[in-house]
Amino acid sequence: MPSPDSVPLEVLERAFQELRAVLGQPDRLNPAHSDPLYYFVYRPQHVLAVKRRLAGWMGILRNDGFEPVRVSLADIVHELIDESGRWEAWLELEHEAEPGDVNQAIREVLARNRALVNCVAERIAAGGPRTIVLLTEDELLHPYFRTRAIESALVGRVPHPTVIFYPGRRVGQYGLHFLGYYPEDGNYRSTLVGGLE
């Protein structure tokens, strides 16, 4: 019987092999024939296991002839907050402020002039014909932004295969359950990989 630690490894490796197959034939396997956007779905408790495997998976994708580029949503969020000039003020007020107020202020920075979406679009637009973008740290969007809002805003702006590493649960062909916290959302139209275990 496999140890509890090895179960996520097997599930994650199966999902990664499924992703490689999808990336090898993206047009045939995208049922909605939309932008080349994919969700690599895994259970939230496997976040660290995915992070540990990411460098190895990037190496495998390189061996497959791709040019993988990692784009961290955590880095983008931090940069946008830093550029807002509000970081120091928030740190000073943090002990007095209600968490909901701080979250709302961060949400406003990310949404103002579509800052988060535009920054993501700019990062995924860079690269060559064999580029694959791996969009990581999706879990850090909670509670500021929903991933589907980013997907919807990126329609027509995804020139390279882009894989969103999504901690949650897959429900059918188009449904996702983010972090096991939010209700199921059945309106995703991109290709979903993994997340059925």
Q: What is each of the regions a protein language model found here?
A:
Residues 56-70, 153-163:
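Structural alpha-beta junctions
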Residues 23-27, 115-126:
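Short, charged beta->alpha transition segments
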Residues 45-49, 76-78, 106-113, 139-143, ...:
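Short acidic, S/G/P-rich loop/turn micro-motifs used as interaction or catalytic elements
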Residues 35-39, 132, 161-163:
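Residue-level preference for the first positions of well-ordered beta-strands
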Residues 69-115, 119:
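Long, charge-dense
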Residues 146-197:
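Glycine-rich, aromatic-bearing surface loops/beta-hairpins
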Residues 128-144:
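Conserved P-loop NTPase "ATPase switch" module shared by AAA+ and STAND
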Residues 2-66:
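Glycine-rich P-loop/Walker A and Walker A-like loops and their local beta1-loop-alpha1 context
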